[in-house]
Amino acid sequence: MEHYISLLVKSIFIENMALSFFLGMCTFLAVSKKVKTSFGLGVAVVVVLTIAVPVNNLVYTHILKENALVEGVDLSFLNFIAFIGVIAALVQILEMVLDRFFPPLYNALGIFLPLITVNCAIFGGVSFMVTRDYNFAESVVYGFGSGVGWMLAIVALAGIREKMKYSDVPPGLRGLGITFITVGLMALGFMSFSGVQL
């Protein structure tokens, strides 16, 4: 149990997808203008990562891994295609659920919801799961923790950006300039967790 708790804390804070690996930055920067929208997208990313990482673990372990289906057959060259296919299917299901039950959030996320399919934070979580050789339980914890870490980062950035609307930012830094500086400072803050040994 202790191993899973340390993996969860590590994936949320120490190896944060957005602020340590800088994955998923396109939606991270574009949607982080309002806390409510950022939280909605963060929940969507948590759901997709929590489901996509373990499902892709099963696909990799039982189909793609060497000797998984047939002795002597290695289908690992199909990793990227299979993983993206699973992620795309999950995002389509999530999009239908949001459209049916949460129309305001669906409309607020707009084009960024289908872009979760190609969000490199999602694919990065799946790729890290394969390279680190996580088992099914570890992949569930890692997927959930990575999603929560990404959501924490985007909600924090949205909160800061909402406050910055009322501040006197120099004209040359308005817009993305001050946002990049803010993200860099947040990344430095999260980098302080890298010395923590779990």
UniProtKB/Swiss-Prot annotation:
One of its GO terms (biological process) is respiratory electron transport chain. Keywords: Cell inner membrane, Cell membrane, Ion transport, Membrane, NAD, Sodium, Sodium transport, Translocase, Transmembrane, Transmembrane helix, Transport, Ubiquinone. GO terms for molecular function: oxidoreductase activity, acting on NAD(P)H, quinone or similar compound as acceptor. It is a multi-pass membrane protein. The keyword Transmembrane applies. The chain crosses the membrane at residues 11-31, 39-59, 77-97, 110-130, 140-160, 176-196. Its EC number is 7.2.1.1. It is found in: Cell inner membrane. It holds the Pfam family Rnf-Nqr. It catalyses: a ubiquinone + n Na(+)(in) + NADH + H(+) = a ubiquinol + n Na(+)(out) + NAD(+). GO terms for cellular component: Gram-negative-bacterium-type cell wall; plasma membrane. Belongs to the NqrDE/RnfAE family. HAMAP family: NqrE (MF_00429). Composed of six subunits; NqrA, NqrB, NqrC, NqrD, NqrE and NqrF. NQR complex catalyzes the reduction of ubiquinone-1 to ubiquinol by two successive reactions, coupled with the transport of Na(+) ions from the cytoplasm to the periplasm. NqrA to NqrE are probably involved in the second step, the conversion of ubisemiquinone to ubiquinol. PANTHER family: INTEGRAL MEMBRANE PROTEIN OF SOXR-REDUCING COMPLEX, NA(+)-TRANSLOCATING NADH-QUINONE REDUCTASE SUBUNIT E. This is Na(+)-translocating NADH-quinone reductase subunit E.
